[in-house]
Amino acid sequence: MPRPEPPPWLSAAAIATAERLLAGHRQAFGRPLLAGVDAGRTPLQAAQELFVAATVVLSHDGAADPRLIYANRAALLLWRRPWGAMVGLPSRLTAEPAERQRRALALEQARRKALSGYSGIRVDSGGRRFRIQNARLWALPDGGGQPGGQAAAFSNWWWLEPPRSGSPPPLSGRPNPVGGTEPGPSVLPLHA
């Protein structure tokens, strides 16, 4: 019997991105992104731990109009998007239009060096605004050690307004790779 396909956040590409996220953060800030994720973990274990972490972690590629290439479970829940809708989304769309220029300037600064203490306003899939505070931004190295995108991580955020009428309900449970959510434990199995 063939092995089932892993969920998209445990694909070979996502595992490689998770490794780059963790290595890039350590290089930029001199400390691990997540407590307990150390060199003794396999890349698969580190990718699983990064995906289920309470800290919001996301990254985009280095294109002229960058697109998200990774979002952990906390990011998917906050932006109320399943993996397939979040990954591939132009990253500028995670911020409201009035914040996009300010965001672009901060990203340019982070491209040259790491940036901590970033704050800004973001918008979820239904248009509901929230503030992030004390985010860390850093260059995401490509396979050759050159900048190949950027990453962000933050734990401090809060809603700026009540849910909008007609907004999609918040995701709860475990994000489903096909879309929507399914209830489940906080630790994901190796295969969906």
Name these PLM-found stretches.
Residues M1-A64, L107, R136-L171, V187-A192:
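PAS-family sensory modules
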Residues F51-R164:
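Sensory/regulatory domains in signal-transduction proteins
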